[in-house]
From Swiss-Prot:
InterPro entries given in the database record: ATP-grasp, CarbamoylP_synth_lsu, CarbamoylP_synth_lsu_oligo, CarbamoylP_synth_lsu_oligo_sf, CbamoylP_synth_lsu-like_ATP-bd, CbamoylP_synth_lsu_CPSase_dom, MGS-like_dom, MGS-like_dom_sf
Species annotation: Yersinia pestis
Binding residues annotated for Mg(2+) 4, in chain numbering: E841, N843
Stretches the record annotates as Oligomerization domain: 404-553
Sequence positions that bind Mn(2+) 3: Q829, E841
Domain ATP-grasp: 133-328, 679-870
Keyword check for Magnesium: yes
Cofactor note as given: Binds 4 Mg(2+) or Mn(2+) ions per subunit.
A biological process from GO: 'de novo' UMP biosynthetic process
Gene: carB
Protein name (Swiss-Prot/TrEMBL): Carbamoyl phosphate synthase large chain
EC main group: ligase
Length: 1077
């Protein structure tokens, strides 16, 4: 039956900011849904607070609202836009929860909006643990022994029945937030307390432990005529007990017999029927007890998910796009498969003749004090995917694409160390982020497959594959470089060994191994992902490399080609913003008639969608892989400045190998990144910088520090996201830094900068074409200097800076752009103190603020800069004027501290945010209030506020206190702060610090006395002493600021109503056009 004609407009709910457990896979699914529904002629209205997404670009929908995904705000949008239907299955848990709330509040009924893609009842039945259990029993499927609790008393009763160890999961949360495994009563009570707090329905599911069972997932698509297909089966390499988002996963499932697979296939279809998913994709998770084969259903998600993004990329079957069309009434047999050029219908189940491996990427090094063991609560921040013809090839390709310094199974421990075996055993038993490497180490240390299995519960089939690779490595090392015959090398390359890994094993340089391989004429061939195991020919060029005979890449040569290098797996400091830039480069150059080639290995992103570029190579962004693709494609130009540090690190070597890099030259990039060369340029231009020095030893550092004066910002050169960057307050601190952190940098010195306390930090994005400079936007940070720019909220236009100061910055940016010969994008960071402008740093590449500036001003910076790189001047593009919008846009960040109990949630020079939201308003206050609502800060309008500030902030705290009183807050203060306020005639209630006796701050936070806390500190000891205040504020959901500037901005925002007015991106950009006219 064709599409529904009773609906004309559809509201799509997005997923909001990127958090652990819900990343950019929902930008990929949302963008697909927008495209699919618009090509069917529907009017599409989109709401998503995440500005860094492709789906919130103005061309993607008819009306785009970058507004908080909060039911009251969405009600305003529904009232204004009057959609006929709402599609809630594209935005993860956030969208489902919002849709249920709109239903509950009667908003959908009030405006006559139908829910499509899933019914409220089906969502509830899948998400409500008790209803789900009953439904499974009804169709004869087993679930884990479990019970439901709404308070501690009920929880303990369930535990008595289920026994320890047991698994605790809160309802309606995602990424396993608040859950965990309890081995005893003490742990049980702690996890339950946290879980009850985090579940919106105050409900816990307590399950028997399935630790050590095997875990499988089925990606199922069903239409309203009950056609069901399995897009892909996925097997978890790691056994139950580790969240599937933190597990290494493999597709298709490798260790099921056909009979077991058929049973699971039928069961997953039965689950969709019973839950009532009539249109679209779902994922069903199963667990199998390896001892007796008992099969149970763990859960199902009635929406597209992280796994469906992986399944889409693994098979080439666009689940989100098909699901969107099914939601408006199509059936699977009516839809055609794009990849085979319509030669097969969508009801044709994909079959694949290769193996796909996904490995998660973790960032524990950014969270000192975090528990880095893997449990049922998700902690990874990104993932890499690789495709190979065998499990071994696929696994080794994924390991090198992860960018954690491994080129394959590099050893983690030295076998000479007497503690080696103890350490290996511990790492195998209690899995951390690096367990896969310790498994290889275990085989090196002589453990047997059974021995490793008993500690890890990883299926023996996978272990045998790894053991074989370790034995091969041993023979490579033994034979040396002369033993690498043509035959042996081909064998090794087919097993997925990288040149760099072989080089390490034989003790040679990577270039020598590559030279030898070229001498043998050994190169990879490229196979296509075609959904049908080569049964039909394919129209899309979606490729992966392997060492076989026949190459299917068939490059074309009639159009000029440009290759874009992506950013690899997401991590803190290099996320979706860089993918956004890569996608824009591809889109702009395609519009201009270039053939675009994308190279990336991140399965969550829009850049790895088969129709974003003309040709997609799903490959790791490493020197070896990129050189091979360049060899076969011969592009006119390669863009390295859009994918963050990943491609930039390769720029020099690519250039040396004769690869044509376009845009800013690698040498110019180096001039900005290398401290001494940069200093020369700055001195030549006569610009001001904070007093600084470059040192290579601890003695030098101590000597220079005395001259510069404390506090100092210390950091290694060449890092992204402030890795290993700290503020040190005295010599003891400095010495500790050198002992703990200095090994971060490769032969590079450490930089000391005088720390400008209380300065206002500013980011400027600009584009230079060699003749003129276009200022994209000047963003004023809300948190003062010393907080990493990626963790600070910022405003465009600036909200306190004078026009004169901004003009000084404009002139300096222009001088720097010409001095450094920038071609394309650049980002400059300044600090302003006492009306003086100091230059902090220059990055001649795409910065993470590019999507924000593009949305706020309507100028697609990444597209403009891509055109500059291929030789179109700014004048030819008609892009000469900086745009200062007639409204405020504020970007606020989202931090993952709730996933890492034990970590101090204070902002500092090392970046730790995972995502961001944007708020738009007529005033700064209105925009910031929306950004706060969008980031789910939970700020209340009144109540009791606690002020506890450091010495340097005391002169400004009186003003903040007065503002809060005016807003109707009652005030508490710690001793030093109270004295200052008292002198100004404000008398707060005095509270004890923890060491001053009870009742102290901690008690009062636990009792729920505060709605707001401002706590600023300086100096390592003071920060350590006040850590508990911040941890408790986070745990008890009290909004807190760790900078005074943040406090002032919050006080301003309290005067505004974030649900008062909604404005679409299209209306915002129209205002700019009118203003120009």
């Amino acid at each position: 039956m064709p599409k529904r004609t009773d609906i004309k407009s559809i509201l799509i709910l997005g997923a909001g900011p990127i958090v652990i457990g819900q990343a950019c896979e929902f930008d990929y699914s949302g963008a697909q849904a927008c495209k699919a529904l618009r090509e069917e002629g529907y009017r599409v209205i989109l709401v998503n607070s995440n500005l860094a997404t492709i789906m919130t670009d103005p061309e993607m929908a008819d009306a785009t609202y970058i507004e908080p995904i909060h039911w009251e705000v969405v009600r305003k949008i529904i009232e204004k836009e009057r959609p006929d239907a709402v599609l809630p299955t594209m935005g993860g848990q956030t969208a489902l929860n919002c849709a249920l709330e709109l239903e509950r509040q009667g908003v959908l009924a009030e405006f006559g909006v139908t829910m499509i893609g899933a019914t409220a009842d089906a969502i509830d039945k899948a998400e409500d643990r008790r209803r789900f259990d009953i439904a499974m029993k009804k169709i004869g499927l087993d679930t884990a022994r479990s019970g439901i609790a709404h308070n501690m008393e009920e929880a303990l009763a369930v535990a008595a029945d289920v026994g320890f160890p047991c698994i605790i999961r809160p309802s309606f949360t995602m990424g396993g937030t608040g859950g965990g495994i309890a081995y005893n009563r003490e742990e049980f009570e702690e996890i339950c307390e946290r879980g009850l707090d985090l579940s919106p329905t105050k409900e816990l599911l307590i399950d028997e432990s399935l630790i050590g069972w095997k875990e499988y997932e089925m990606e199922v698509v069903r239409d309203k005529n009950d056609n069901c297909i399995i897009v892909c089966s996925i097997e978890n390499f790691d056994a139950m007990g580790i969240h599937t988002g933190d597990s290494i996963t493999v597709a298709p499932a490798q260790t099921l017999t056909d009979k077991e697979y058929q049973i699971m296939r039928n069961a997953s279809m039965a689950v969709l029927r019973e839950i009532g998913v009539e249109t679209g994709g779902s994922n069903v998770q199963f667990s199998v007890n390896p001892k007796n084969g008992r099969l149970i259903v763990i859960e199902m998600n009635p929406r597209v998910s992280r796994s469906s993004a992986l399944a889409s990329k693994a098979t080439g079957f666009p689940i989100a796009k098909i699901a969107a069309k099914l939601a408006v009434g199509y059936t699977l047999d009516e839809l055609m498969n794009d990849i085979t050029g319509g030669r097969t219908p969508a009801s044709f189940e994909p079959s694949i003749d290769y193996v796909v491996t996904k490995i998660p990427r973790f960032n524990f090094e950014k969270f000192a004090g975090a528990n880095d063991r893997l449990t049922t609560q998700m902690k990874s921040v990104g993932e890499v995917m690789a495709i190979g013809r065998t499990q071994q090839e696929s696994l080794q390709k994924a390991l090198r694409g992860l960018e954690v310094g491994a080129t394959g199974f590099d050893p983690k421990v030295s076998l000479d160390d007497p503690e080696a075996l103890t350490k290996i055993r511990r790492e195998l038993k209690e899995a951390g982020a690096e367990r896969i490497w310790y498994i290889a180490d275990a085989f090196r240390a002589g453990m047997s497959v059974d021995g490793v299995f008993n500690l890890t519960n990883v299926d023996r089939w996978f272990l045998v594959q790894i053991e074989e690779l370790v034995r091969l490595e041993e023979s490579v090392a033994e034979l040396g470089i002369n033993g690498l015959t043509a035959e042996f090398m081909r064998h090794l390359k087919r097993k997925g060994f990288a040149d760099a890994r072989l080089a390490k094993l034989v003790g040679a340089a990577e270039s020598e191994v590559r030279k030898l391989r070229y001498k043998y004429g050994l190169h990879p061939v490229y196979k296509r992902v075609d959904t049908c195991a080569a049964e039909f020919s394919t129209d899309t060029a979606y490729m992966y490399s392997t060492y076989e005979e026949e190459c299917e890449s068939n490059p074309t040569s009639d159009r000029p080609k440009v290759m874009v290098l992506g950013g690899g797996p997401n991590r803190i400091g290099q996320g979706i913003e860089f993918d956004y830039c890569c996608v824009h480069a591809s889109l702009a150059l395609r519009e201009d008639g270039y053939e675009t080639i994308m190279v990336n290995c991140n399965p969550e992103t829009v850049s790895t969608d088969y129709d974003t570029s003309d040709r997609l190579y799903f490959e790791s962004v490493t020197l070896e892989d990129v050189l091979e693709i360049v060899r076969i494609e011969k592009p006119q130009g390669v863009i390295v400045q859009y994918g963050g540090q990943t491609p930039l690190k390769l720029a020099r070597e690519l250039e040396a190998a004769g690869v044509p890099i376009i845009g800013t030259s690698p040498d110019a990039i180096d001039r900005a990144e290398d401290r001494e060369r940069f200093q020369q340029a700055v001195n030549r231009l006569g610009l001001k910088q904070p007093a600084n020095a470059t040192v290579a030893t601890i003695e030098q550092a101590v000597e220079k520090a005395t001259g510069l004066g404390y506090p100092l910002v210390v950091r290694p050169s060449y890092v992204l996201g402030g890795r290993a960057m700290e503020i040190v307050y005295d010599e003891i601190d400095l010495r500790r830094y050198f002992q703990n952190a200095v090994s971060v940098s490769n032969d590079a010195p450490v930089l000391l900068d005088r720390f400008l306390d209380d300065a206002v930090e500013v980011d400027v994005d600009a584009i230079c074409d060699g003749e003129r400079v276009l200022i994209g936007g000047i963003m004023e940070h809300i948190e003062q200097a010393g907080v990493h720019s990626g963790d600070s909220a910022c405003s465009l236009p600036a909200y306190t800076l004078s026009k004169e100061i901004q003009d000084v910055m404009r002139q300096q940016v222009e001088k720097l752009a010409f001095e450094l010969c920038v071609r394309g994008l650049m980002n400059v960071q300044f600090a302003v103190k006492n009306n003086e402008v100091y230059l902090i740093e220059v990055n001649p590449r795409a910065a993470r603020t590019v999507p924000f500036v593009s949305k706020a001003t309507g100028m697609p910076l990444a597209k403009i800069a891509a055109r500059v790189m291929v030789g179109q001047s700014l004048a030819e593009q008609g892009m000469l004027e900086e745009i200062i919008p007639p409204y405020y846009s504020v970007k606020e960040v989202v931090l993952p501290f709730n996933k890492f109990p034990g970590v101090d949630p204070i902002l500092g020079p090392e970046m730790r945010s995972t995502g961001e939201v944007m708020g738009v308003g007529r005033t700064f206050a209105e925009a910031f209030s929306k950004a706060m609502l969008g980031s789910q800060s939970g700020m209340k309008k009144s109540g009791r506020a606690l002020l506890s500030v450091r010495e340097g902030d005391k002169h400004r705290v009186v003003d903040l206190a007065a503002k809060l009183l005016k807003q109707g807050f009652e005030l508490d203060a710690t001793h030093g702060t109270a004295v200052v306020l008292g002198e100004a005639g404000i008398n707060p209630r005095l509270v004890n610090k923890v060491h001053e006796g009870r009742p102290h701050i901690q008690d009062r936070i636990k009792n729920g006395e505060y709605t707001y806390i401002v706590n600023t500190t300086a100096g390592r000891q003071a920060i350590e002493d006040s850590k508990l205040i911040r941890r408790s504020a986070l745990q008890y959901k009290v909004h807190y600021d760790t900078t005074l500037n943040g406090g002032f901005a919050t006080a301003m925002a309290l005067n505004a109503d974030p649900t008062d007015q909604v404005i679409s991106v299209q209306e915002m950009h129209a205002k700019i056009k009118n203003m120009k006219a």
